[in-house]
């Protein structure tokens, strides 16, 4: 089977009126230099597009298994009406491309509507931490009632709406059935404890829970000591210092957890991972 390439996808986005069937009049988001803005997960490359006055993620399969892996989830979502999730549709034979032999072919893509709002990863500081925790509790209960497991929950995969609701996106690993999101929700709660409300001017006299300790000056945030390392946040992101406040891992991460047994979970612009 011939597999389309990322180059084919990029080429199609440059001329959607020629390459797409349903999405002929879509408009991809572009970079400052005029190129198409792309991101990728392990299964799909993604481009944010505007189509019929709404924003979507157009998801291009990176392997022949990618579409197969999401077919059951997409089929269930097609008939599910809930404010907790957004449209996630497989468009069959949507993209036309030319393979290396000069043969014209088509491939499937996934069209995923983005909620109105912004990712939690970039706007948590603008919302009260307690309100975000409450929204997480409601989302967890709601998804459990639906029998829906996202299986890749992280700040970049949750959108905050103008009324403070949380809506998950990117259902590439989602399943209906037994839940596996408990750990993901706990990590999100830790994230909002640390980031929620940091950008607000608080009017109450209660001191902030997170302060810079006297022995670790010069940081926006100082965490607990773990494995002889202290998690800190500076203007450039999260990093780690030793017990003498000397940099061990320079601040560079969007978010980071404390070290446990020699490893720590971190978030970069590309996603979540582990460092040691």
Kindly give the residue locations of the regions a language model identified.
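Catalytic-loop of the protein kinase fold
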Residues: 144-156, 160
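Conserved protein kinase catalytic/activation segment
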Residues: 157-169
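Conserved alphaE helix
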Residues: 131-139
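C-lobe/activation-segment region of protein kinase-like
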Residues: 167-199
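Conserved structural core of kinase catalytic domains
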Residues: 87-130
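Juxta-kinase regulatory segment immediately upstream of eukaryotic protein kinase catalytic domains
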Residues: 1-38, 69-72
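ATP-binding glycine-rich loop module of kinase domains
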Residues: 42-90
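Residue-level detector of conserved, function-critical positions
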Residues: 200-276
């Amino acid at each position: 089977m011939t597999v389309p390439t990322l180059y084919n996808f990029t080429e199609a986005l440059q001329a959607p009126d020629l390459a797409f069937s349903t999405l002929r009049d879509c408009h991809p988001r572009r970079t400052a230099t005029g190129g198409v803005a792309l991101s990728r997960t392990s299964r799909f490359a993604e481009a944010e597009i505007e189509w019929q006055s709404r924003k979507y993620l157009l998801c291009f399969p990176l392997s022949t298994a990618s579409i197969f892996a999401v077919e059951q989830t997409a089929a269930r979502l097609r008939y599910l009406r809930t404010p907790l999730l957004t449209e996630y549709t497989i468009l069959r034979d949507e993209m036309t491309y030319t393979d290396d032999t000069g043969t014209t072919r088509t491939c499937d893509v996934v069209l995923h509507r983005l909620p109105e709002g912004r990712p939690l990863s970039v706007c948590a500081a603008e919302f009260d931490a307690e309100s975000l925790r409450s929204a997480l509790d409601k989302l967890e209960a709601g998804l459990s009632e639906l029998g829906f497991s996202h299986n890749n929950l992280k700040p970049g995969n949750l959108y905050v709406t103008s009324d403070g609701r949380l809506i998950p996106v990117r259902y590439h690993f989602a399943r209906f059935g037994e839940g596996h999101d408990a750990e993901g929700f706990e990590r999100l709660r830790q994230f909002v404890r640390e980031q929620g409300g940091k950008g607000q001017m608080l009017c109450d006299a209660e001191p902030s829970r997170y302060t810079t300790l006297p022995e670790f000056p010069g940081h926006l945030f100082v965490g607990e000591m773990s494995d002889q390392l202290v998690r800190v946040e500076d203007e450039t992101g999260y990093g780690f210092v030793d017990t003498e406040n000397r940099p061990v891992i320079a601040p560079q991460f969007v978010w980071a957890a404390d070290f446990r047994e020699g490893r720590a979970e971190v978030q970069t612009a590309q996603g979540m991972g582990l460092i040691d």
